[in-house]
Amino acid sequence: MDPILLGKGITDDIAVTLLPKLGNRHGLVAGATGTGKTVTLMTLAEGFSRLGVPVFLADVKGDVSGLAVPGTGAENLLKRAAEIGVADYAPAASPTIFWDLYGKLGHPVRTTVSEMGPTLLARILELNDTQSGVLDIVFKLADDRGLLLLDMDDLRALLGLVAEERKDISTEYGLVSAQSIAAIQRSVLRLAQDGGENFFGEPALELADIMRVNHDGRGMIGILAADQLVLKPKLYSTFLLWLLSELFEQLPEVGDLDKPKLVFIFDEAHLLFDDAPPSLVQRIEQVVRLIRSKGVGVYFCSQFPDDVPGNILGQLGNRVQHALRAFTPRDQKAVKTAAETFVPNPKLDVAKVLSQLGTGEALVSTLQDKGVPMPVQQTMIAPPHCRMGPITDAERAQVRAGSPVGSRYDTAINRESAAELLAQRAQKTVEQAQAPAARSREQDEAQEGGFGQAIKDAIFGTKRRQGMIETMAKQTTRTVGTKLGNQIVRGILGGIFGGKR
């Protein structure tokens, strides 16, 4: 199987390639803003797609969408391709599927609250340890009572139930404070305003739909529209982490293949690790270490190589380092880290060259036969065949119209789950509370004959019309009954739905 051509070595005048059989050994693409990282990602995605490997990546700036349409074939690109040795270079599109958590620029991406789980949901909600513990109790309570947590309404309903039965739940599951519940409810409200209502629900994303191969044998490139999503860093990074965890948990062990089953590109990777607790970082490290045996290659993209923790950085065998500008002590440290992580090349002063690289140039080291990293090469990156810029709305609509997943995800499904079941139980409670009062009124009316009727006739007269005194008496009775009924409804439904009317 032909390797993926990344570019041409300037240092040793050789073709710099990535071996497909080692594509699952993960990778890193790093460099300052404007140095060509996005073009490198597009070249990687195209290369894997041509080999029949599906790719999933986020489009943070909008220009990755250009993968879906052919390039312009500009003279400078043709010249660069000839210099690098790209055979038969011609503009070409890649098979793509657009996804969007908000459902505007692609197929909606959804998962259920249960599938996300309390740990990752707590990260999205930015809860502290105490509040995270209460969220664990909410999930445990849902399991014990057979209540499905599918969407935000279900989560709000369970939080209301916990608030209503707080004392009993605290005795059985552990202390639950009203303050913690209120804090979680406020966080849920913020998440809903940030688009959580669209993300949580059904139909949930099926992994098979991001691992498709088209009829020509090319891997489909799944592009997640993230230009708005990245403005919510916790939601963006946690969604990608959830997706990576789902791949790890659901895919079977396959060992080393001749090419990966999927390549997962994580742009703006620093967002994944910012403020992440040690336990979560340890989990990510475990997933990255083990997921390669399931045929998945993970490629992180960020400005600085040390944005990725050292234990994870050490597992990234294929590296492309674009220019770093050493203006600050932070930048100087990053340059030193980058230089130390490459296999030395006696012809190259890595620390010096890093700050002198031009746009479209990079220091590259990939794994060769037997998994041995090649000495670092200053490399001229090969141009992609697609458009190096965003597509138009009309072009996007055309791609979506031909999507192989059709309209499967375009319409949300709201099946019976926790919110509906708790509402039904609340309604039954209200009906049971009102039933005795109704029976009492029937008995009173039955007793209006005989002695009771004689008394009534003596006081109010025999005509079947309400006098002022009777009218006032009945209005008073109805008012008291209505207020009591409303209080019961508010007490039950208000607790379940967090005060929502």
Tell where the protein language model's regions lie, with residue ranges.
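The conserved Walker
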Residues: V29, T33, A276, P305
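Conserved P-loop NTPase motor module
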Residues: L5, P108-S114, L125, V320, ...
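P-loop NTPase motor domains
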Residues: A45-V55, G62-Q286, I312, Q356-L357, ...
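Membrane-active amphipathic alpha-helices enriched in small hydrophobic residues
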Residues: E448-I459, M468-I496
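N-terminal pre-Walker A segment at the start of P-loop NTPase domains
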Residues: M1-A15
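Pre-Walker A (Motif I) flank of P-loop NTPase domains
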Residues: I14, L22-G27, V53, R218-G222
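Conserved ATP-driven motor cores of ASCE-family P-loop NTPases powering translocation/secretion/packaging/pilus
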Residues: T43-A45, A68-D88, Q286-V372
